[in-house]
């Protein structure tokens, strides 16, 4: 499981940062990639990666400001040009209005999509659990931006314990149907009367990962709830230390506020993105140092950076 950041800037493209987009790579888990936001130039950024557009099966939009959605029509159209590859349907999750934006853009531009898009729109009355699959559950809450904006909490369901095949063979169990029974948690008895207890050969279930992705927002308790015990919290940091009033006036957060959210939520790791273009390399290192006085495991991410979860 990996995160890759396609755009980490705020507001408009800059030389060193594109606007908002990131992907959650779930190739080993479900052979899919999930995208979060799709700002202008996202498809160009994808060309610098190993991501295959047809693997992107779900897109989650945090809000309808242009730096988070202006790349969506272009990406959807380019995804359709992959005639040599299997066309797969796509699901888009986001605030009310995202369907109208996409369908009108496709219609007005005369674009044709050879795959279906299934829309899931949300408002204040439909927050909470928004998606559940065999392996993942996704929750959403409203944040505190200048327009309706959502944060997402992706919860991987607990993983089954693994079978210690070598120990089972050493205990005299032949590979075959009996192996399968033990793997499924059944106790068995061998021909010589030896009893094999499945619990002795299967490890304890492993806790699934939690990934929280916070859209544009002022500091809010909703962010703490979404980030509770998260393995990774991705939080916007449009502003730096001392800019709290400006951040509040514009519906954004500082690095220090993001660190407070991570600390209060008990998150394990904080990744700061949506960084203003005025913050360059040295400034970003200072942002990390300042935030680390509140929450130690913090990093300002860069475009195209990959993070293993």
Swiss-Prot record:
Keywords: Endonuclease, Hydrolase, Metal-binding, Nuclease, tRNA processing, Zinc. Gene3D superfamilies: Ribonuclease Z/Hydroxyacylglutathione hydrolase-like. Transmembrane segments: none annotated. Pfam families: Lactamase_B, Lactamase_B_2. Its cofactor is Zn(2+). It catalyses: Endonucleolytic cleavage of RNA, removing extra 3' nucleotides from tRNA precursor, generating 3' termini of tRNAs. A 3'-hydroxy group is left at the tRNA terminus and a 5'-phosphoryl group is left at the trailer molecule. The active site is at 67 (proton acceptor). One of its GO terms (molecular function) is 3'-tRNA processing endoribonuclease activity. InterPro entries: Metallo-B-lactamas, RibonucZ/Hydroxyglut_hydro, RNase_Z/BN. It is an enzyme of class 3 (hydrolase). Binds 2 Zn(2+) ions. Zn(2+) 1 binds at residues 63, 65, 145, 216. The keyword Metal-binding applies. Its EC number is 3.1.26.11. Belongs to the RNase Z family. Zinc phosphodiesterase, which displays some tRNA 3'-processing endonuclease activity. Probably involved in tRNA maturation, by removing a 3'-trailer from precursor tRNA. This is Ribonuclease Z. It comes from Streptococcus equi subsp. zooepidemicus (strain MGCS10565).
